[in-house]
Amino acid sequence: MKKLIILGIVLGISLSGCKKDEPAPVQDNEFISTMRLTFTEGTNKLVYSIKDLDGDGGNAPVIDVIKLLPNKTYTFTTEFLDETKNPAVNLTSEIKAESAEHLVIFEPNSTNLLSVTRTDKDSRNFEVGLMATAKTTTAANGTMKVTLKHQPEVGGQPTKNGTATIGTTDFEGTFKVEIK
């Protein structure tokens, strides 16, 4: 009988000392309502944006048409904002600080429309895309999809490898583009 009591106590202590490991907390992404591209050619600045203040679903986003001149090279920046807050919160500096976990992808629907080259790099020498150049060719119309990918570390190891296939989409939108 004593053995059963002792066994019960030992079993109770050993079971109460075991607990499941809690999963690592998932980092919530900030809400991004607006993506803004600012093109510069010489002294001319052109600003275009996609605004989706209510997120996926609900109202359709407001999307500017990018209008550029043919046979020009533009430098441009990409910014991400949360304009649902007052004042609006510019999230670009946070993305830049975490550049080893982010990639902006530019996908013109035709190379005859324009070509985009990312010009900024992260600490591992992978492109980021907050700064870029765009080269236009002849007059043309088309689209350009812009995607911000979040490519966080997994198990303390970086996942970003310079490709768009890894990670989750933080923001995505497609601009109409007119070169004329």
Where are these regions (language model features)?
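Bacterial Sec-dependent N-terminal signal peptides
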Residues: G8, G12-L37
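Positively charged n-region of N-terminal signal peptides that target proteins for export
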Residues: M1-L4
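First exposed extracellular module after export/assembly in secreted or surface-exposed proteins
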Residues: V26-K180
